[in-house]
Amino acid sequence: MKALTTRQQEVFDLIRDHISQTGMPPTRAEIAQRLGFRSPNAAEEHLKALARKGAIEIVSGASRGIRLLTEEEHGLPLIGRVAAGEPLLAQQHIEGHYQVDPSMFKPNADFLLRVSGMSMKDIGILDGDLLAVHKTQDVRNGQVVVARIDDEVTVKRLKKQGNVVELLPENSEFTPIVVDLRQQSFTIEGLAVGVIRNGEWL
């Protein structure tokens, strides 16, 4: 984390103390009120500066979308088991952060997903591996994707035709998952861009 200005440190300390006391971060309005800013927009500018310096992470779309980053949290987040119906990158799913250079992968990786099962073993994605994932919904047929069907997250090869999606395994012991988009909820969470073999270095 880069050095903070006096004012930035005040904002950071306020966020940390508020989380410690209430279990949640303050809103922009609360920061502005506590520190005497003229408007929540002034608080937002300080939050952006803290994010640029690696002190916090801003979670878009939430009034309390602020997360403190400790030094060990720099790196790619590792997602473990995903609870039904919850966002993939929800804080409770993050097992840790690993110092992996995102630019090792093309396109850059945004997070790591711990693989469960052997349905993709024929292309070298094994149980316990860490799958590097680029967060996007812009994917093409034939690519390996991280998909959510209703409340379940899976890694498969994509084949989409009209209102029907087939998620194809790379293991003859598994059958394709067929999704009818007219009846089921389906979301692409990201594109698989690489694999890190599970090993003792983790």
Curated annotation (Swiss-Prot):
GO terms for molecular function: DNA binding; serine-type endopeptidase activity. Keywords: Autocatalytic cleavage, DNA damage, DNA repair, DNA replication, DNA-binding, Hydrolase, Repressor, SOS response, Transcription, Transcription regulation. It catalyses: Hydrolysis of Ala-|-Gly bond in repressor LexA. Disulfide bonds: none annotated. Its EC number is 3.4.21.88. One of its GO terms (biological process) is negative regulation of DNA-templated transcription. It comes from the Bacteria. Residues 28-48 bind DNA. The record marks A84, G85 as: Cleavage. The active site is at S119, K156. The keyword Cytoplasm does not apply. CDD domains: S24_LexA-like. Homodimer. Belongs to the peptidase S24 family. Represses a number of genes involved in the response to DNA damage (SOS response), including recA and lexA. Binds to the 16 bp palindromic sequence 5'-CTGTATATATATACAG-3'. In the presence of single-stranded DNA, RecA interacts with LexA causing an autocatalytic cleavage which disrupts the DNA-binding part of LexA, leading to derepression of the SOS regulon and eventually DNA repair. This is LexA repressor. It comes from Klebsiella pneumoniae (strain 342).
